[in-house]
Amino acid sequence: MAKASNNSAAQRVRKKVKKNVAEGVVHVHASFNNTIITITDRQGNALAWATSGGQGFKGSRKSTPFAAQVAAESAGRVAMEYGVKNLEVRIKGPGPGRESAVRALHGLGIKITAISDVTPVPHNGCRPPKRRRI
């Protein structure tokens, strides 16, 4: 005789607990090809994230300031559901979406407490790629 399967474990849906976070950190990774925005709490636990490519921009349109603005607004709205009011911004990379992402977060009504550039600078480490000849 077949054993009755335990469907109660499969039917149990884990409800996501919304924690209330007043202050957070925005990590903006702006490369030449894409912009990745991650909003975390002070401990580094991710609350929200968005990318230019995830907002529907493909190809060369991903690397525009407007795509970074749309991604920042999307991540900012999700973070506001967690009760985020103040944000510290950490920008990494040389991409075109650096400034527009910060402006978009400020436009949502979130207070920007600090802006810092955390772009890694090598102390003459790896050899860089060869220069482009157009």
Swiss-Prot record:
Give the matching Gene3D superfamilies: Ribosomal protein S11
Is Cell wall biogenesis/degradation included in the keywords of this UniProt record?
no
What is any one GO biological process for this UniProt entry?
A: translation
Q: Which GO terms describe its molecular function?
A: rRNA binding; structural constituent of ribosome
* Entry-linked InterPro entries: Ribosomal_uS11, Ribosomal_uS11_bac-type, Ribosomal_uS11_CS, Ribosomal_uS11_sf
Keyword annotations: Ribonucleoprotein, Ribosomal protein, RNA-binding, rRNA-binding
Q: Which GO terms describe its cellular component?
A: ribonucleoprotein complex; ribosome
Q: Pfam families, per this entry?
A: Ribosomal_S11
What is said about its interaction partners and assembly?
Answer: Part of the 30S ribosomal subunit. Interacts with proteins S7 and S18. Binds to IF-3.
Q: What does this protein do?
A: Located on the platform of the 30S subunit, it bridges several disparate RNA helices of the 16S rRNA. Forms part of the Shine-Dalgarno cleft in the 70S ribosome.
Its family? Belongs to the universal ribosomal protein uS11 family.
Q: What is this protein called?
A: Small ribosomal subunit protein uS11
> From which organism does this entry originate?
Paraburkholderia xenovorans (strain LB400)
Organism ancestry: Bacteria, Pseudomonadati, Pseudomonadota, Betaproteobacteria, Burkholderiales
